[in-house]
Amino acid sequence: VTSNADRICTGITSSNSPHVVKTATQGEVNVTGVIPLTTTPTKSHFANLKGTQTRGKLCPNCLNCTDMDVALGRPKCMGTIPSAKVSILHEVKPVTSGCFPIMHDRTKIRQLPNLLRGYENIRLSTRNVINAETAPGGPYTVGTSGSCPNVTNGKGFFETMAWAVPKNKNKTATNPLTVEVPYICTKGEDQITVWGFHSDDETLMVILYGDSKPQKFTSSANGVTTHYVSQIGGFPNQTEDEGLKQSGRIVVDYIVQKPGKTGTIVYQRGVLLPQKVWCASGRSKVIKGSLPLIGEADCLHEKYGGLNKSKPYYTGEHAKAIGNCPIWVKTPLKLANGTKYRPPAKLLKERGFFGAIAGFLEGGWEGMIAGWHGYTSHGAHGVAVAADLKSTQEAINKITKNLNSLSELEVKNLQRLSGAMDELHNEILELDEKVDDLRADTISSQIELAVLLSNEGIINSEDEHLLALERKLKKMLGPSAVEIGNGCFETKHKCNQTCLDRIAAGTFNAGEFSLPTFDSLNITAASLNDDGLDNHTILLYYSTAASSLAVTLMIAIFIVYMVSRDNVSCSICL
């Protein structure tokens, strides 16, 4: 056989590989490309959540008013609360009301603005829930105070409560009295009813109520009952933010009445009876933040503010977030987006013991810039390289599938967190930080493992792609080439760049490249001389010679073995 044949091999690209990915079983692996899955955000201002109504202050048009002012119905802070799916808890320190001094620490009243923020739709009723003047223990005069001025700077009081001061002939001590609080909101709305009581020093208690002893109060709604006893005297003169200083104090609380449910208030003298009530429906997610809200963002994060999502995950400081947010992970994650790094392949010059060409060393092919997998030919023309775009696209599709799977995992975890947020207690709408951190650690570990397994699968699938290419190449070449191992074939014709490109495109025709211009193989058939021997005789000679040689070798090996064990001695005489 005489040949000027070329060699065609399947292979994977070889290029600089500065990237490293982590896998489940192989540890860190160098690859030709990666897709970063994480980002580390920087702090920014808070923003409106894209595509979502975002509420900053409860009443944006109520100037110089705190959310507590709005929640209690301070006369100068009456306005419309806009609907919102997201609310910003922007008041980070205990907030007072610019009205009559309140004993905030006696009740859960500080939570009232938070409670209202947790609703999508909030409105103040147009009518009073109780006629305060004719309530049990009356008749009453509805009291006002100069420390709580109205819009004309006259004396006023909170719109949500009526200060029930007994009329002159009725200023006497009384046993506990009961008033029912009816449900007056529209079906489907929660009713938030604000009430309270006033106390002062002994002298003023007698003047106002005809009784200087501590008074008892109880509220009950939805199976929750709360008891209070008023404190008499001992208060320094003060006001909340403005107005006249007061020696007295008020204690304010609220009850939440579910649709159709009636509440109950048991009271003595100094009661602040409910008046206008809050009617609220829907859910609004609450997150701690700051004002003003500038622009829009995909995500609102308690630590980083408004974020625009560029990666599915983030590293850095973990905190609560709402919106289309990346999920927190402990370490940076990268998905393999290429092939495992291989050094440039080299052709073995040596032949094996039986004369077969061993093929190419394991490695990658340089110059395969149009794809990851493909073919290379070596011959007089030099080196030709062609990428198999179909195989490369299949590999890319696998990576895309892995990326989509990771995104689905992200969405499921996000929905899990979102579901937890929706189930929070109405009053505070916050997760316990320790539980939240534990959940975040667990999710981070799940995501990290998913990425490790994805990288493992992407890298391991390279062998599948190469095997598929080898089968494809073998089928196309057919009898025009001889398989020599390691994905390589020795052709019976020349295969330059044009030939290789057609192989990569799947349009190769062996007959076209077997023309004389390609220096096809010149094979001279061996002939048998007619010496009067037939084929059977020739085969007999060959088999006899081979058998004799085998027997001779076996005897020689046996003698050498026996001599080495001193079982046979050999003397040579001259």
From Swiss-Prot:
Post-translational modification: Palmitoylated.
Keywords: Disulfide bond, Fusion of virus membrane with host endosomal membrane, Fusion of virus membrane with host membrane, Glycoprotein, Hemagglutinin, Host cell membrane, Host membrane, Host-virus interaction, Lipoprotein, Membrane, Palmitate, Transmembrane, Transmembrane helix, Viral attachment to host cell, Viral envelope protein, Viral penetration into host cytoplasm, Virion, Virus endocytosis by host, Virus entry into host cell
Alphabetized InterPro entries for the sequence: Capsid_hemagglutn, Hemagglutn_HA1_a/b_dom_sf, Hemagglutn_influenz_A/B, Hemagglutn_influenz_B
Pfam families per the UniProt record, alphabetical: Hemagglutinin
GO molecular function, one term: host cell surface receptor binding
Disulfide bonds: C9-C488, C65-C77, C99-C148, C495-C499
Glycosylation sites: N30, N64, N150, N170, N237, N308, N337, N496, N522, N535
GO cellular component: host cell plasma membrane; membrane; viral envelope; virion membrane
Transmembrane intervals: 543-563
Membrane topology: Single-pass type I membrane protein
Subunit-structure text: Homotrimer of disulfide-linked HA1-HA2.
HAMAP family per the UniProt record, alphabetical: INFV_HEMA (MF_04072)
Protein name, as recorded: Hemagglutinin
Organism: Influenza B virus (strain B/Maryland/1959)
Lineage summary: Viruses, Riboviria, Orthornavirae, Negarnaviricota, Polyploviricotina
